[in-house]
Amino acid sequence: MFGLSKEVISEIEKKAAHFNKIYKNCLKVKNEDVLIISDYGTSISQLPLMMTTGYVLAAKDKGLPVNVVFQGVKKGFMQADDHITEAIKRLEKKSIIILALSNKLGRFGEEKSFRTYCQDKGHRFLSSTGLGDVKNDYFDLFLEAMNVNYRRLQKRGLAVKRLWDKASSITVKTDAGTDVTFDVEGMQAISNTGEYGEEGCGGNMPCGEVYIPPKGLTGVEGQVVIDASMKVDQGAQLVEEPLTLTIQDGKVVKMEGKHAKLLEATLRKYEDRAEYPLRVRHVAELGVGINPGAVVIGSMIMDEKVLGTGHIAIGSNSWFGGAIKTIFHGDQVFKSPKYYVDGKKMSV
């Protein structure tokens, strides 16, 4: 199937329960049409094909009508292939779309965004992007992050969300040197815990984070030491040496460390293409990982969900309630954070 060996398919079949669990517990499927959008992987990763195979086998097991479409790997500012856009637009309302992609879907035709389109049409969706960063050997680890107790995960996420929704400020500290404060007065947190059963809902898989935008453009001050993984134009990668970001008036003004040049090159690339380049370096998000089944592997779809990590994002946040609209969004992950909500230490 899809060019995978019999041995690989056999291993995927052994994990069928994991994929069935997603259809049942997260998407709450009945008899909807399922569209899976994928690509053929990269030189180091066949994970998009492996995930696609798992979802296809589980859909067939449930008797769901399933269609799979492939496109080339999309990077930077590339558009989704025309036949992909057409396949999405042919779907009946209130269908299910699953993305299993090496990097990203690509810009979605003339629509505002894939997420907005799904909301308008009542489609439920799962998004597993950036899989090209994940070696085949990590397939089992990836599935373990999906095979969690979703009731417990949702309970944990809701507790954090309720606390953050009431907060005026959140400070994060780490022994590595992070000490940053977010003004979040009046902002609403998002709990991404796999509750994708309602019309127009969807999100990441694996899931398991709570995140919040800062108030306005200038509501972040301090220093963040990135010591787990980072997102740059080439994709996500593990951090070999800590990367220190200095933030003033909500904006990254200084970067220090081995990987500073790489992040700087990424930000400059997007500034050169952005309609409003001054927005690209703004800090857009504070997040906390709450998934006990996830581990840091150098793939942002997983790393930002790991229990015992925190993250910030640089760039856009307009789609989740923030004031920054731009063409870049890059998460940066750090280990062992301590969160203080209005001065009081928070338990995760």
What are these regions (language model features)?
Residues 169-172, 243-246, 253-255, 310, ...:
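Short polybasic amphipathic segments
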Residues 238, 254-314:
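Dual-mode signal for accessory low-complexity, basic/Gly-rich regions
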Residues 309-348:
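Intrinsically disordered terminal and processing segments
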Residues 40, 176, 186, 228-230, ...:
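A broadly conserved detector of short glycine/acidic/proline-rich loop/turn motifs that flank catalytic sites
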Residues 213-264:
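Oxyanion-binding "anion nests"
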Residues 46-50, 298, 323-324:
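Short, glycine/acidic-enriched capping/hinge loops at junctions between secondary-structure elements
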Residues 1-223, 231-232, 238, 338-348:
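Active-site bordering "gate/hinge" segments
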